[in-house]
């Protein structure tokens, strides 16, 4: 997941925090109005956070078939999946998905600087030690913990010279950050600080100084100068990349982090583990710097007793410091040589692990995590003491040569982890720890509050505990030598939790310690054949790992010296053990839940590696120098096979626990990445909404401007219309005045007409009265005439009636005469008839 800062106004100019603390820190007010809602403002990082930087891990990979170094373009072709049994492909293939996650996650080391000295916390972050093999040369201040905390990421906190004097940090200073946020941050940081693949080897960087300068592109220097602060530009010019300030700009006598840093865990994919930052003490006035390592080797018990000081401080001469600085600056590119350190009698210097080119210097890490770890330390010590007192202490870690580990048979008491297979996941030799390690540890006593319980244990015990599910487990080693005095003192320190201190954690003034300074003229290389004899043959490897292989662990361990091609032409100095752990951690992190019986990544330490053998660095004597003492080697190789098998079982249990914890932390990191992606989506959506709102507002403004222009034109036309209307109004006014005049004249006419009407009315009344009189007279005359006519009619009617009665009487007379005539006629007729008859 990568958090890309969206706007520079939310980012300060000081790019000194690259951790995940911004997820838990409250947002700060920028003084500007924000376009985000209240719910969206919580998703924006605070102002004082730096931009996210992608760190690329550019240690060259090798092709599985040709074993050639791959270019960055060819390395991307190895992402093809391989079968579970394809251990060769798993060994040589760098998990790109892990690398991509590491590029996205913010990488930060809790480093504190005091006068240019990198200070580390006393309690080590050993959560991801993985298969930290027991055979591991923890010489005086040369190893910082079991399995060698790999590639101490101190370079990310380089400090400018001008600010180095102002960085004195008190050991008891505690930040106000919440413990829960810090623990989750530490867990996510420890998970992604993985180690380089098993196919990569460590190379003596002094021989590749010129090659690194030739291969480093010019753009890297320019990029480094551009990205680092002003105080770290000098450091970038010398190395081509951002070198650690503790190496490039340290005062004379200061030891670089590679001088006593832990061997990197080579089996886990991804980048190297970062060592936690620690508390610091003042630097001595003589300009020298002493580095404290809590875990020291047992062969120091043979040295004078004045070597027993708090933390096994070691002081380098200026010549050695310059050589170490050259190694630190040149160890960032190219393959590195794998070397084994079995000469524990002398103090050995760590070969610098591969430098990651993508890191930037000049970043000051926060000071919160170290203080929280100091608070967590007493609880972890009490839990560890309870474990060591209840159960038996695991025996000495065994040197695993070449074997195949079957997880199903781990519970079988007769199972031998070394049997049968010649392939190995990791191989180391763990020298017994010095019995005087517990003496003079003021910082450890301050951090671990409770008194330690004293119980006897075997020769070498490895104690592992975890304070809580979120606390970082601390691997604690307690060893004893075969001598009687060493055994007696180791019993007192077997169950005591020792704080794991990384290089530069507690510089103690040299005038307070009795250990003499390390001189390079005392270092020499001696052929193992001169010490152990030539009885070990090549065919003796066939018996390695079998149940009958019990008689000579000394001869078995001598094979590492006799047949290791890396030690054939190695320089005459005790070289550190390069830890090659298996990739069980990387294989177990697959989301499909790979079963327990998955094979380990197989790496043959006895096979020839096709890499150039570098020559001795400057200031190191030639192989022909004085021989080394053989006592520490013999003491180391006298451990029995049973002890080695027991330690293998303990280491496997530790690996199971660490693997499950790594899976849990990996899941948390993935969830955190999803959350950050959602945060980014919310911010992007908010910005898109703001952009859309701006576009809409612009469109509305354009529309309003157009409306304004339209209204202006309408107003002009309305003014013209109003002027025309006003002219018409003036004309109408004149017309109305004419109407008023006409009305007055009409009123006069009406008055005249009314006067005439009244006069005519009067005349009408007069005429009406005259007509009425005449009508009355006419009516009277008509009545008289009518009465006369009626009288005359009555007279006429009476005369008519009289005449009608005369007519009726005459008619009756006529009728009677007629009847009489008829009767006379009939009588006559009768008489005539009768007369005729007669």
Swiss-Prot record:
<keyword id="KW-0963">Cytoplasm</keyword>
<feature type="region of interest" description="Necessary but not sufficient for spindle localization">
    <location>
        <begin position="522"/>
        <end position="577"/>
    </location>
</feature>
<feature type="modified residue" description="Phosphoserine">
    <location>
        <position position="71"/>
    </location>
</feature>
<dbReference type="GO" id="GO:0060236">
    <property type="term" value="P:regulation of mitotic spindle organization"/>
</dbReference>
<dbReference type="GO" id="GO:0021987">
    <property type="term" value="P:cerebral cortex development"/>
</dbReference>
<feature type="modified residue" description="N-acetylserine">
    <location>
        <position position="2"/>
    </location>
</feature>
<feature type="modified residue" description="Phosphoserine">
    <location>
        <position position="250"/>
    </location>
</feature>
<keyword id="KW-0175">Coiled coil</keyword>
<dbReference type="InterPro" id="IPR007707">
    <property type="entry name" value="TACC_C"/>
</dbReference>
<feature type="region of interest" description="Disordered">
    <location>
        <begin position="123"/>
        <end position="227"/>
    </location>
</feature>
<dbReference type="GO" id="GO:0005829">
    <property type="term" value="C:cytosol"/>
</dbReference>
<feature type="compositionally biased region" description="Basic and acidic residues">
    <location>
        <begin position="204"/>
        <end position="227"/>
    </location>
</feature>
<keyword id="KW-0132">Cell division</keyword>
<comment type="subunit">
    <text>Interacts with microtubules. Interacts with CKAP5 independently of clathrin. Interacts with CKAP5 and clathrin forming the TACC3/ch-TOG/clathrin complex located at spindle inter-microtubules bridges; TACC3 (phosphorylated at Ser-558 by AURKA) and CLTC are proposed to form a composite microtubule interaction surface. Interacts with CCDC100/CEP120. The coiled coil C-terminal region interacts with AH receptor nuclear translocator protein (ARNT) and ARNT2. Interacts with GCN5L2 and PCAF.</text>
</comment>
<keyword id="KW-0007">Acetylation</keyword>
<dbReference type="GO" id="GO:0007052">
    <property type="term" value="P:mitotic spindle organization"/>
</dbReference>
<feature type="region of interest" description="Disordered">
    <location>
        <begin position="569"/>
        <end position="594"/>
    </location>
</feature>
<comment type="function">
    <text>Plays a role in the microtubule-dependent coupling of the nucleus and the centrosome. Involved in the processes that regulate centrosome-mediated interkinetic nuclear migration (INM) of neural progenitors. Acts as a component of the TACC3/ch-TOG/clathrin complex proposed to contribute to stabilization of kinetochore fibers of the mitotic spindle by acting as inter-microtubule bridge. The TACC3/ch-TOG/clathrin complex is required for the maintenance of kinetochore fiber tension. May be involved in the control of cell growth and differentiation. May contribute to cancer.</text>
</comment>
<dbReference type="GO" id="GO:0034451">
    <property type="term" value="C:centriolar satellite"/>
</dbReference>
<dbReference type="GO" id="GO:0005737">
    <property type="term" value="C:cytoplasm"/>
</dbReference>
<keyword id="KW-0498">Mitosis</keyword>
<feature type="modified residue" description="Phosphoserine">
    <location>
        <position position="402"/>
    </location>
</feature>
<feature type="modified residue" description="Phosphoserine">
    <location>
        <position position="177"/>
    </location>
</feature>
<dbReference type="GO" id="GO:0005794">
    <property type="term" value="C:Golgi apparatus"/>
</dbReference>
<dbReference type="GO" id="GO:0043231">
    <property type="term" value="C:intracellular membrane-bounded organelle"/>
</dbReference>
<feature type="modified residue" description="Phosphoserine">
    <location>
        <position position="317"/>
    </location>
</feature>
<dbReference type="GO" id="GO:0036064">
    <property type="term" value="C:ciliary basal body"/>
</dbReference>
<dbReference type="GO" id="GO:0000226">
    <property type="term" value="P:microtubule cytoskeleton organization"/>
</dbReference>
<feature type="modified residue" description="Phosphoserine">
    <location>
        <position position="25"/>
    </location>
</feature>
<keyword id="KW-0131">Cell cycle</keyword>
<feature type="modified residue" description="Phosphoserine">
    <location>
        <position position="434"/>
    </location>
</feature>
<dbReference type="GO" id="GO:0007091">
    <property type="term" value="P:metaphase/anaphase transition of mitotic cell cycle"/>
</dbReference>
<dbReference type="GO" id="GO:1902850">
    <property type="term" value="P:microtubule cytoskeleton organization involved in mitosis"/>
</dbReference>
<keyword id="KW-0597">Phosphoprotein</keyword>
<feature type="compositionally biased region" description="Basic and acidic residues">
    <location>
        <begin position="403"/>
        <end position="412"/>
    </location>
</feature>
<keyword id="KW-0206">Cytoskeleton</keyword>
<feature type="modified residue" description="Phosphoserine">
    <location>
        <position position="175"/>
    </location>
</feature>
<protein>
    <recommendedName>
        <fullName>Transforming acidic coiled-coil-containing protein 3</fullName>
    </recommendedName>
</protein>
<feature type="coiled-coil region">
    <location>
        <begin position="637"/>
        <end position="837"/>
    </location>
</feature>
<dbReference type="GO" id="GO:0007097">
    <property type="term" value="P:nuclear migration"/>
</dbReference>
<dbReference type="GO" id="GO:0000922">
    <property type="term" value="C:spindle pole"/>
</dbReference>
<feature type="compositionally biased region" description="Polar residues">
    <location>
        <begin position="492"/>
        <end position="503"/>
    </location>
</feature>
């Amino acid at each position: 997941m990568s958090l890309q800062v969206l706007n520079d106004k939310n980012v300060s100019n000081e790019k000194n925090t690259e951790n995940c603390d911004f997820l838990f820190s409250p947002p700060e007010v920028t003084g500007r109005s924000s376009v985000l809602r209240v719910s969206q403002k919580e998703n924006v990082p605070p102002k004082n956070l730096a931009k996210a930087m992608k760190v690329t891990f550019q240690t060259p990979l090798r092709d599985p078939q040709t074993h050639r170094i791959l270019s960055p373009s060819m390395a991307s072709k190895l992402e093809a999946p391989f079968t579970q049994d394809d251990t060769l492909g798993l060994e040589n293939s760098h998990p790109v998905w892990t690398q991509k996650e590491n590029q996205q996650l913010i990488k930060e080391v809790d480093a504190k600087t005091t006068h240019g000295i990198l200070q580390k916390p006393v309690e080590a972050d050993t959560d991801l030690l993985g298969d930290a093999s027991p055979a591991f040369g923890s010489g005086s201040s040369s190893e910082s913990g079991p399995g060698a905390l790999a590639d101490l990421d101190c370079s990310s906190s380089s400090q400018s010279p001008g600010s180095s004097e102002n960085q004195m940090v008190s050991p008891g200073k505690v930040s106000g950050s919440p413990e829960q946020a810090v623990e989750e941050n530490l867990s996510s940081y420890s998970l992604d600080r993985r180690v380089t693949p098993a196919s990569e080897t460590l190379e003596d960087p002094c021989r590749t100084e010129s090659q690194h300068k030739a291969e480093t592109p010019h753009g890297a220097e320019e990029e480094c100068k551009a990205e680092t602060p002003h105080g770290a530009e000098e450091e970038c010019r010398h190395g081509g990349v951002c070198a650690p300030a503790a190496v490039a700009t340290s005062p004379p006598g200061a030891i670089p982090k590679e001088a006593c840093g832990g061997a990197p865990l080579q089996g886990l994919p991804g980048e190297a583990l970062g060592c936690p930052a620690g508390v610091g003490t003042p630097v001595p006035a003589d300009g020298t710097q002493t580095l404290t390592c809590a875990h020291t080797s047992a062969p120091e018990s043979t040295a004078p007793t004045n070597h027993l000081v708090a933390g096994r401080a070691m002081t380098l001469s200026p010549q050695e410091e310059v050589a170490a600085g050259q190694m630190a600056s040149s160890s960032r590119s190219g393959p590195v040589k794998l070397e084994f350190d079995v000469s524990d009698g002398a103090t050995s210097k760590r070969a610098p692990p591969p430098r990651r080119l993508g890191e930037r210097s000049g970043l000051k890490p926060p000071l919160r995590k170290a203080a929280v770890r100091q608070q967590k330390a007493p609880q972890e010590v009490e839990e560890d003491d309870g474990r060591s007192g209840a159960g038996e202490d695991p025996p000495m870690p065994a040197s695993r040569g070449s074997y195949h580990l079957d997880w199903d048979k781990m519970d079988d008491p007769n199972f031998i982890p070394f049997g049968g297979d010649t392939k190995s996941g990791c191989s180391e030799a763990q020298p017994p720890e010095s019995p005087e390690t517990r003496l003079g540890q003021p910082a450890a006593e301050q951090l671990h509050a409770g008194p330690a319980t004293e119980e006897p244990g075997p020769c070498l015990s490895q104690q592992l505990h975890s304070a809580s599910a979120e606390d970082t487990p601390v691997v604690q080693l307690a060893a004893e030598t075969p001598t009687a005095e060493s055994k007696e003192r180791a019993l007192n320190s077997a169950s005591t939790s020792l704080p794991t201190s990384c290089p530069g954690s507690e510089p103690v003034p040299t005038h307070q310690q009795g250990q003499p300074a390390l001189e390079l003229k005392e270092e020499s290389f001696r052929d193992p054949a001169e010490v152990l004899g030539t009885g070990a043959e090549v065919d003796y490897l066939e018996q390695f790992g079998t149940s009958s292989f019990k008689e000579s662990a000394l001869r078995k361990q001598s094979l590492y010296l006799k047949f290791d091609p890396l030690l054939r032409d190695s320089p005459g100095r005790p070289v550190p053990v390069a830890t090659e752990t298996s990739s069980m951690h990387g294989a177990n992190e697959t989301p499909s839940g790979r079963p327990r019986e998955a094979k380990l990544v197989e790496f043959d330490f006895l096979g020839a590696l096709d890499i150039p053998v570098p020559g001795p660095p400057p200031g190191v004597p030639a192989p022909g120098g004085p021989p080394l003492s053989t006592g520490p080697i013999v003491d180391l190789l006298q451990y029995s096979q049973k002890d080695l098998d027991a330690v293998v079982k303990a280491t496997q249990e530790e690996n199971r626990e660490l693997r499950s914890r790594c899976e849990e932390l990996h899941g948390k990191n993935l969830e955190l990445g999803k959350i950050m992606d959602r945060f980014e989506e919310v911010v992007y959506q908010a910005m898109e909404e703001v952009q859309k709102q701006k576009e809409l507002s612009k469109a509305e403004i354009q529309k309003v401007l157009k409306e304004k222009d339209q209204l202006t034109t309408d107003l002009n036309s309305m003014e013209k219309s109003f002027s025309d209307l006003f002219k018409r109004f003036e004309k109408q006014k004149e017309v109305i005045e004419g109407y008023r005049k006409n009305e007055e004249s009409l009123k006069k006419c009406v008055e005249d007409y009314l006067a005439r009407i009244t006069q005519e009315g009067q005349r009408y009344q007069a005429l009406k009265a005259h007509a009425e009189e005449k009508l009355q007279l006419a009516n009277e005359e008509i009545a008289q005439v009518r009465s006369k006519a009626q009288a005359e009619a009555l007279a006429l009617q009476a005369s008519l009636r009289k005449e009608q009665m005369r007519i009726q009487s005459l008619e009756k007379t006529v009728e009677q005469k007629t009847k009489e005539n008829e009767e006379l006629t009939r009588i006559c007729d009768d008489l005539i008839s009768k007369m005729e008859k007669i």
